[in-house]
Amino acid sequence: MQILLAALVAYLIGSVSFAVVVSAAMGLADPRSYGSKNPGATNVLRSGNKKAAILTLVGDAFKGWLAVWLARHFGLPDVAVAWVAIAVFLGHLYPVFFRFQGGKGVATAAGVLLAVHPVLGLATALTWLIVAFFFRYSSLAALVAAVFAPLFDVFLFGTRHNPVAWAVLAMSVLLVWRHRGNISKLLAGQESRIGDKKKAAANGGAQDGGKL
């Protein structure tokens, strides 16, 4: 019962879509209506508003970190922490507050990993940054980071008595699945690079005074 309740709370935390909330608060178009139609920081950046993209990134990462931190703070066992990690991630992917139309989970996964262990989170984030810097594809960086995250976890903590390792693996598999469309575009040479701006509809990306 304790695990179920913790997972439910984590799912609700994950269901807060900062891309949609921040965009609405700043008078921007719904990120689900332009660009990749993904409610995430990369797509919000396509609106031309860097501040909104940064706030989205921080918010999505924070909720992942918060859910796991709360589980640890209240002394829940590792099995519960593992379920909390998966639940907050699923909340971001399929948010109950936004008709289950969520993002792809990169920032939220990063927040979860940072809460599991700072070294794990930083190693995975560094992997993303290196790939993104050299190739300028957010999706490719996310896919590579998703592959390496479980490997980093096993290297740092092993698999014995480590249920969180299975949660990390599950998140990685889900993240790759959510990027299946991006994989097709990458193979076809049609994927957008970081920094590409796609005009938003209705009060969207090219709003006056909105670009930073």
Swiss-Prot record:
Disulfide bonds: none annotated. Keywords: Cell inner membrane, Cell membrane, Lipid biosynthesis, Lipid metabolism, Membrane, Phospholipid biosynthesis, Phospholipid metabolism, Transferase, Transmembrane, Transmembrane helix. Signal peptide: none annotated. One of its GO terms (molecular function) is acyl-phosphate glycerol-3-phosphate acyltransferase activity. It is a multi-pass membrane protein. InterPro entries: G3P_acylTferase_PlsY (IPR003811). Its main location: membrane. The chain crosses the membrane at residues 3-23, 51-71, 78-98, 115-135, 139-159. The keyword Cell membrane applies. Catalyzes the transfer of an acyl group from acyl-phosphate (acyl-PO(4)) to glycerol-3-phosphate (G3P) to form lysophosphatidic acid (LPA). This enzyme utilizes acyl-phosphate as fatty acyl donor, but not acyl-CoA or acyl-ACP. PANTHER family: GLYCEROL-3-PHOSPHATE ACYLTRANSFERASE-RELATED (PTHR30309:SF0), INNER MEMBRANE PROTEIN YGIH (PTHR30309). Probably interacts with PlsX. This is Glycerol-3-phosphate acyltransferase. The lineage of its organism: Bacteria, Pseudomonadati, Pseudomonadota, Betaproteobacteria, Burkholderiales. The gene is plsY.
